[in-house]
Each structure stands twice: as structure tokens, then as C-alpha cells.
Amino acid sequence: MREFFKDFGMISFPAGNTGVQMGGWFRKEIKSVADFKGLKMRIGGLAGQVLAKLGAVPQQIAGGDIYPALERGTIDAAEWVGPYDDEKLGFNKVAPYYYAPGWWEGNAALHMMVNQAKWNELPKHYKSIFTTAAAMLSTGSAG
């Protein structure tokens, strides 16, 4: 990344990642591929296409409609964001089975960007502090 951003006068520091994405909340336990047959799941894109090949029925539902759809049984499962956000929306109350990882959505690396000219002006000890902080962010979010 540093080589890429060099042309823009920036220096990049890896500073964490978004973590593993989850596979979704399910009203019923998934024990085999056969359990996907007829399963109505809020999921889109490539993942929806793949799960459809397994017999699932992908559903396009807005984020705010997921909880009531799970609660009423309009859908059987839903993939959304991740543990923190999903729990805040209460999915665990209406769909007790939570599976991981979400193979269809890899995590993203996060970076702190600094103007190269300003970086060059910093005293060595500030550079060391900044570099160490970025490394700690990456280490702390690795798992």
C-alpha cells in the first residue's frame, strides 16, 4: 500500500481490520446442506446466488425490517453486519442460532494515512509513537 500511496504524497500505516464477518442468525439449527432447502434468508449478492443453488430462497429486506421479519417467521435467517450491531438489533432474541464465518464477505484492512511531507517533518520519537500505535491497533483487532 505504501508504494501505491507514495504517488499521492501519502504514507499508509496498517491500523487494524474489520474482523471476521459472521454467517448469520437462524431460527432453526443448520445441521446439513439439506437444511438450506426452502430456507428463506435475508442475503444478497454472490452469497445469495450460491445459497440458492443449495435450495435457499434469498430475500432482499431492508435492515430495519429484519427483526420483525425474523420474529414473524417471514424469513428463517438473516445475515447483517456482525455481533455488536446484530445484538443491538436483538436478532439473538428471535433467531438463536448464529453461525460463522461468513465466507462471502472477507474482512477489510484499515489504514491511517499521513501526508508524507508532514511525516518527514516529525521528530523521530513522534514517528515511533505513531508507528507503535498503528501496530497495536493491527494486533488488537486481529482476532
Spell out what each predicted region is.
Residues 1-143:
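N-terminal secretory/targeting leader peptides
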